[in-house]
């Protein structure tokens, strides 16, 4: 099971999209078991877009979650989420902004996470 981290932006977006705690827990379990779920989004630095079903509905009417998984040494980051009715795809400007966020996360995490077997 892989660690999953929720960003503040994700929490705010999840509330705006109407995602409840049970749905969030299900999403975390899914990503913990399969951190590479979803399709890689070009121009985002490795973000993935995962279609996730709303309670009582299918994936086609569900959520679009944007996640980052950058390898075994890092957790899966929940970056944002939106309902299909809110938006279908991200604009080029939004993808560029995600790339900047990804770079900041990877840089910050790399400075704090020792290599496996490294002694501090």
Language model features: what each stretch is:
Residues 1-22, 117-120:
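Arg/Lys-rich, positively charged N-terminal/basic patches that mediate binding to nucleic acids
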Residues 21-24, 60, 95, 99:
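Amphipathic alpha-helical transducer elements in NTP-driven molecular machines
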Residues 69-120:
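Enriched for short, Lys/Arg-rich terminal
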Residues 24-28, 32:
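Short, well-structured alpha-helical segments
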Residues 6, 27, 44-48:
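A generic structural signal for short beta-strands and their flanking turns/coil linkers
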